[in-house]
Amino acid sequence: TVKTKDRSLSAQYEHTIVVTDNGCEILTLRKDDTIPAIISHNE
């Protein structure tokens, strides 16, 4: 956990994802996690 410039708290998290010819699977997904059907990517 870190503090931002305005002193708010912030945290970073990551998931391990495997990509195959048939799609992808999130290996680190916990039972209480929800993942959106579409993940937005902004360049």
Curated annotation (Swiss-Prot):
Keywords: Aminopeptidase, Hydrolase, Metal-binding, Protease. GO terms for molecular function: initiator methionyl aminopeptidase activity; metal ion binding. Its cofactor is Co(2+); Zn(2+); Mn(2+); Fe(2+). It is an enzyme of class 3 (hydrolase). It comes from the Bacteria. The keyword Hydrolase applies. It catalyses: Release of N-terminal amino acids, preferentially methionine, from peptides and arylamides. Binds 2 divalent metal cations per subunit. Has a high-affinity and a low affinity metal-binding site. The true nature of the physiological cofactor is under debate. The enzyme is active with cobalt, zinc, manganese or divalent iron ions. Most likely, methionine aminopeptidases function as mononuclear Fe(2+)-metalloproteases under physiological conditions, and the catalytically relevant metal-binding site has been assigned to the histidine-containing high-affinity site. The keyword Metal-binding applies. GO terms for biological process: proteolysis. Its EC number is 3.4.11.18. Monomer. Belongs to the peptidase M24A family. Methionine aminopeptidase type 1 subfamily. Removes the N-terminal methionine from nascent proteins. The N-terminal methionine is often cleaved when the second residue in the primary sequence is small and uncharged (Met-Ala-, Cys, Gly, Pro, Ser, Thr, or Val). Requires deformylation of the N(alpha)-formylated initiator methionine before it can be hydrolyzed. This is Methionine aminopeptidase. It comes from Klebsiella oxytoca.
